[in-house]
Amino acid sequence: VKAAGLAFNRNQILQYYMIFGGVPYYWGFLKKGQSLSQNIDSILFEKDAPLRDEFKYLYASVFKKPENYVKIIEALGTKKVGMTREEIITSTKIPNSGDLTTKLEELESCGFIRKYNAFGMKKKNAVYQLMDSFTLFYFKFLKSEPTDEHFWTNQINTPAVNTWLGLAFERVCMEHVDQIKMKLGISGVLTEVNSWYCKSDPDHGVFGSQIDMLIARKDQVINLCEMKYSQSEYTITEKMDRSIRNKISDLIIVSGTKYAIYPTLI
């Protein structure tokens, strides 16, 4: 960005990364003299925008027969926490075979999805989650083919964009676990990074929780990470404090973990 002479601040650079990730090709479309929102409109939303139809070409450029890859991606795009293999089969109607395994492995190796094990669950119940920044943005804003050529400029600070910013920031955090560990001072500690969720069970004192990132450490500590996007200094509210306490309680009750749990705000 600096080399191109673009006068963007850290937050604007982050927002562009949330859309396109770190792929250099996409960063080459930014133009000097335009604001970030003007750039995004000219790159994605104007009538002849160069990347308006990028989704059509993205998977076709990587895979010879992209149809079933796209089916998997579209299925995963409907569920934030991801899907198990069985759920993918049910949603896509793709047969349970070695070919499906290959497709999932290829999507993972290309960085489109990630495979993780929910904390405390067996490996056979692995979850596949959509991670590609542009694909997530496409499903949220481009798939409906908006006709407003100034769509992004006119959507700033709307609930839809603010919700997307929060979700996109979570994905950025998941892509930068090594940097988060370094900041926490645990770079040398062996860890597993998981997500976790449980349903409400009032009879057993379980509130029902979704934790997008747990860093389970070899030194018997779990960093329960809350990832919050904010353009100003973030203040923990009473509601959020109660939510974090409920998540800690649920994790202890449902998983039976004996690890110390450190709430960690990112």
Where are these regions (language model features)?
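Short amphipathic alpha-helical interface segments
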Residues: K64-V81
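Short amphipathic alpha-helical interaction segments
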Residues: K93-C110
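A cross-kingdom feature that marks ATP-driven nucleic-acid transaction machinery
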Residues: A118-M121, A126-I266
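Amphipathic alpha-helical "lid/sensor" segments that cap RecA-like P-loop NTPase cores
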Residues: A4-L58
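A short, conserved structural fragment
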Residues: E108-F119
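Non-catalytic, well-ordered alpha-helical scaffold segments
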Residues: N11-L14, P24, Q38, E67-V70, ...
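Short acidic, hydrophobic short linear motifs in intrinsically disordered regions
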Residues: K79-S91
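The alpha-helix within a helix-turn-helix
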Residues: K2, Y17, E87-T90
